[in-house]
Design a protein with these regions (language model features):
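C-terminal cap/substrate-recognition subdomain and adjoining C-terminal extension
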Residues: 1-13, 17-19, 91, 98-232
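Active-site neighborhood of HAD-like aspartate-dependent phosphohydrolases
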Residues: 2-68
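Generic secondary-structure boundary/loop-capping signal
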Residues: 23, 78, 162-163
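Surface-exposed loop/turn and secondary-structure junction residues enriched for glycine/proline
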Residues: 33, 39, 84, 138, ...
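A metal-dependent, Asp-based hydrolase signature
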Residues: 33-36, 47-113
Length: 232
C-alpha cells in the first residue's frame, strides 16, 4: 500500500484530517465469483415449482436480455425470490453466507489480507459492490469483519417477495459514494471494467487478477498507468 496519497481534508471535526479512504469491490476481489448470482441460482434450483414459471417467462426474459444484462438479472432474481419475504430472505442469506465462508476456497486470502492491512493502518475501508446489501453484510459478519462499511445494491420486500430496487453498478457506484460524502480515495481495488467510474475517483487504481489486455483497456479508459495484482 506504499506510495498512496492521502485525500484532502473532508468534513467532520474542524481542522481534523479525514482518514484516507480505500475502496474494495467484492466480486472476484474478496470473494471468488458473484455471491448474489450464486445465491439466486441456488434459490431457483431449490424450488422446482419455479421452473415452469421460468419457462413461461422466457419470451419476456429474452426481451429483458436485449434491453440490458442488468435488467435480465433483476428479473431472474425476482423469479428466484418469488414468495420470499424479508424475514425469510434474511435467514436465507445468513445461511448462504455462513456456507460460503466455511468453504475456504471461496474467499481470496490475499484480498482479505489487504483489506485488513488497510484497516490496521487506520484507513477507512469501504466495500462497494453490486451484491445485495444484506448478503454482503452477512458475508463480512461471517468473516469477522462486521465493522466494514458496505455500499451495495438495494433489494426491497414487495407483495410478491424480494425485488431489486437499485442496482449498484458502474456509474451508480459513484453516485452512491457521493451520497455518503465520498468523492475521492487513495486507492480502489476491482476486477471489473464496469468499475471504471469508481477507479476515476482513486489516486491509485488497482486491477485485481486482470489480464494484460484488460489492463491495457483500463489504462486507456483512465489515461494513466494502473497497478495490477495477482491475488489468491
Amino acid at each position: 500500500m506504499g506510495g498512496l496519497v492521502a485525500p484532502a481534508v473532508a468534513g467532520g471535526d474542524e481542522g481534523a484530517p479525514a482518514r484516507p479512504v480505500v475502496l474494495f469491490g467484492l466480486d472476484d476481489v474478496l470473494v471468488y465469483g458473484e455471491p448474489m448470482q450464486v445465491f439466486l441460482r441456488q434459490r431457483l434450483r431449490a424450488a422446482s415449482w419455479r421452473w415452469p414459471l421460468l419457462l413461461a417467462c422466457l419470451p419476456w426474459l429474452l426481451v429483458r436480455a436485449l434491453m440490458s444484462r442488468a435488467r435480465l438479472r433483476a428479473t431472474l432474481g425476482r423469479l428466484a425470490l418469488l414468495g420470499v419475504h424479508e424475514a425469510r430472505y434474511q435467514h436465507l442469506v445468513d445461511d448462504f453466507a455462513a456456507g460460503l465462508v466455511r468453504r475456504s476456497r471461496s474467499c481470496s486470502r490475499d484480498g482479505l489480507r489487504a483489506l485488513r492491512h488497510c484497516m490496521a493502518a487506520g484507513q477507512r475501508v469501504v466495500v462497494v459492490t453490486a451484491c445485495e446489501q444484506r448478503l454482503a453484510q452477512a458475508i463480512f459478519h461471517e468473516l469477522g469483519l462486521a465493522e466494514v462499511e458496505v455500499l451495495a445494491s438495494n433489494w426491497r420486500d414487495g407483495w410478491s417477495g424480494m425485488r431489486q430496487a437499485q442496482a449498484n453498478l458502474g456509474a451508480e457506484k459513484v453516485r452512491l459514494l457521493a451520497r455518503h460524502g465520498l468523492q475521492d480515495c487513495v486507492a480502489a481495488y476491482s476486477a471489473s471494467l464496469l468499475d471504471v467510474p469508481m477507479w476515476r475517483l482513486a489516486a491509485q487504481a488497482v486491477l485485481v487478477n486482470g489480464t494484460p489486455g484488460c489492463c491495457r483497456r483500463l489504462e486507456q479508459a483512465l489515461g494513466h498507468a494502473v497497478t495490477r495484482v495477482a491475488w489468491h
